[in-house]
Amino acid sequence: MGYVDLHSHVLFGVDDGAPDPAASVALLDALAALGITEQCVTPHQKASQFMPDWALVESRLAAVEALRTAKHPTLRLGAENMWDDVFYRRIATDEIPHYAGTSAFLIEIPPSLMPPGMSEQLFKFRMAGKLPVLAHPERYHDLWDNPRLTRELRKNCAFVVDLGAVGGFHGKREAKAARALLEDGLACAVATDAHQVGDLQQSAVGLAWIDKKLGHAAVTRLFDHAPRQILAGELPD
């Protein structure tokens, strides 16, 4: 069936990902070469930096769909939602952009500032039948060397580790955290977070590390079975 990638910035001209249509196609080529058959496109929703109009996002999705060929992964629209003032307003109005057709949505938080009441809000999301998905948990300083908090958040949230971090490309501290989450069984899935073609080369190194250290069954679980569970609204064990 192939891999399912929950996090990427393939759509051109909406954030810090692909700058133009050719770059989007180059990313699709590289994603296909990595073995990905379903690609979630998750443009930033970040008030301080990237907040593209949703009509523009949808038009860019249509444009990339028109460029996509049979060899490329299918596309599913989502968003990478920064936990900021806009996110709080969207909680109140129930307007958080989800992975299309699912109860799951991707979130990120500031690296050095855990949002107040985050654990309680994650619980509320789950009680409402929603599945929050935390992007790159290895980046968040408050989770470093804090297993109690890490496990508390993990109870109501799917952790999706960046493959580039696993491969050691995002810093030594992030690599240590990413690998610990995998080895301790706290990572639900892995993703590329691809912004450019070079990110896929880093992702391949991360996959090779998982294959060597944890076995190929772990690669399949983290990059195929678990992402499909998440898109079905299920929190993987």
What are these regions (language model features)?
Residues 1-71:
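An N-terminally biased module of ancient metal coordination in phosphate/nucleic-acid-related enzymes
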Residues 3-6, 39-42, 76-80, 133-135, ...:
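Active-site neighborhood of phospho(di)ester-bond hydrolases with catalytic His/Asp-centered motifs
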Residues 23-27, 60-64, 121, 149-153, ...:
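A general structural detector for well-ordered alpha-helical segments in enzyme core domains, enriched
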Residues 32, 126, 182-183:
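Non-catalytic positions within long, well-ordered alpha-helices that form the structural scaffold/packing
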Residues 46-49, 82-84, 139-143, 166-169, ...:
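Active-site environment of divalent metal-dependent phosphoester hydrolases
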Residues 51-160:
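Extended substrate/RNA-proximal surfaces in nucleic-acid metabolism proteins
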Residues 186-202:
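Short acidic/histidine-rich active-site segments
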Residues 204, 208-237:
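Mid-to-C-terminal alpha-helical segments outside catalytic/metal-binding sites
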